[in-house]
């Protein structure tokens, strides 16, 4: 099973193909990830590798977390993720994994991250509800959601009903994005299209589960 890496969204720009076509890309900085733990089926019940990215002062983490990193003899990180693996022999605690070890240009990836927080939003903005008539007898009900239930039966609002509330700041995954370029010297990935989050936010990049690179 392929693993992914942790990175930080830098922003968006564009690159040009040899034919002169402009391609919008998201730039992700992926500093070398460090293996903080290798979980085995014998000890943990399943096989997985735990990665950490970024850096964090040891004084800013709790003693149990600091001890976890010290056991692997690595610096404390500000991001952590776990990937299931088939073989535990390929990874050792303290191992450093770079972008060139996992990704190649032309393959497709899935990118996960936290979307931009929008605060409290109504149903028109949050769920794309249509607005009611601007005039013709309609007053003070232009952006209201309308009825949220039925009658005495069932006598309640169903779970999952689309209503106003906190919008954004939720985990989101964009699938099957093309990896345009891998810059191993500067630890950068250029990914075609938009990815979740604001510039500077943490993202998780992993090989696509639904789509393979051309020719495979």
Curated annotation (Swiss-Prot):
PROSITE patterns: RIBOSOMAL_L3. InterPro entries: Ribosomal_uL3 (IPR000597), Ribosomal_uL3_bac/org-type (IPR019927), Ribosomal_uL3_CS (IPR019926), Transl_B-barrel_sf (IPR009000). Residues 132-155 are annotated as: Disordered. The modification N5-methylglutamine is found at residue 152. GO terms for cellular component: cytosolic large ribosomal subunit. One of its GO terms (biological process) is translation. Gene3D superfamilies: 3.30.160.810, Translation factors. SUPFAM superfamilies: Translation proteins. Keywords: Methylation, Ribonucleoprotein, Ribosomal protein, RNA-binding, rRNA-binding. Methylated by PrmB. GO terms for molecular function: rRNA binding; structural constituent of ribosome. One of the primary rRNA binding proteins, it binds directly near the 3'-end of the 23S rRNA, where it nucleates assembly of the 50S subunit. Part of the 50S ribosomal subunit. Forms a cluster with proteins L14 and L19. Belongs to the universal ribosomal protein uL3 family. This is Large ribosomal subunit protein uL3.
């Amino acid at each position: 099973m392929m693993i992914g890496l942790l990175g930080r969204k830098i922003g968006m720009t564009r690159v040009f193909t040899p034919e002169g076509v402009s391609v919008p890309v998201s730039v992700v900085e992926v500093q070398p990830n460090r293996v903080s733990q290798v979980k085995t089926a014998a000890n943990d019940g399943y096989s997985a590798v735990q990665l950490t990215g970024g850096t964090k002062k040891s004084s800013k983490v709790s003693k149990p977390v600091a001890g976890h990193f010290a056991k692997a003899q690595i610096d404390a990180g500000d991001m952590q993720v776990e990937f299931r693996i088939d073989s535990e022999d390929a990874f050792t605690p303290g191992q450093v994994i770079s972008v060139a070890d996992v990704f190649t240009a032309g393959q497709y990836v899935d990118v996960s991250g936290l979307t931009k927080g929008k605060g409290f939003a109504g149903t028109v903005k949050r769920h794309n509800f249509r607005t009611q008539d601007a005039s013709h007898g309609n007053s003070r009900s232009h952006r209201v959601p309308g009825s949220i239930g039925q009658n005495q039966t069932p006598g309640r609002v169903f779970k999952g009903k689309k209503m106003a509330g906190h919008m954004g700041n939720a985990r989101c995954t964009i699938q099957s994005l093309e990896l345009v370029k891998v810059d191993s010297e500067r630890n950068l990935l250029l990914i075609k299209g938009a990815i979740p989050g604001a510039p500077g936010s943490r993202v998780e990049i992993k090989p696509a589960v639904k789509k393979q690179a051309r020719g495979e």
